[in-house]
């Protein structure tokens, strides 16, 4: 019997991939990466949309205590299929490490400079702290479950129920679609007049 995380990872793929499958989009390009942290290198995974031509908006995925497990990697891959350059640290980050990662993502050659953060499990508590940090270079955030109280935010934050917390595919799909629509809207380049 598959684990709950395997089920949720599969659900992410089912929620994110139908449109991709219909359009026959190429899968995301995924690789292990290192980037500069505060006094040491950080390690994780990067997923780049397979359809990407030029820089794309970026998303930092903050997972729970398990770090880059199967569930978190499925989430990062699904975000890349949705059109976002995605960074998933291998282990949970401190606030300073997360801010360094946001700075690195904002200036990464694959990214547009617009960066969001998505938190799941224990990683969701860091989203609120980052959204209040003036030096985070953050455009918006999405919290799936997790922390109920957060500091006053300087950027828009979308709070959604925990993903994978039940067996209601319709509710899960609705939350996923809300998150993708929110990220797409918030990470759009400024309109020229």
Where do the language-model regions lie?
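N-terminal export signals
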Residues: 1-22
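Primarily recognizes the serine-hydrolase "nucleophile elbow" in alpha/beta-hydrolase
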Residues: 103-153
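Short beta-strand element of the alpha/beta-hydrolase
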Residues: 55-64
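Short amphipathic alpha-helix adjacent to the substrate-entry channel of hydrolases
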Residues: 70-89
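Serine-hydrolase catalytic-loop signature spanning alpha/beta hydrolases and amidase-signature enzymes
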Residues: 66-68
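C-terminal catalytic histidine-bearing segment of alpha/beta-hydrolase fold enzymes
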Residues: 158-193
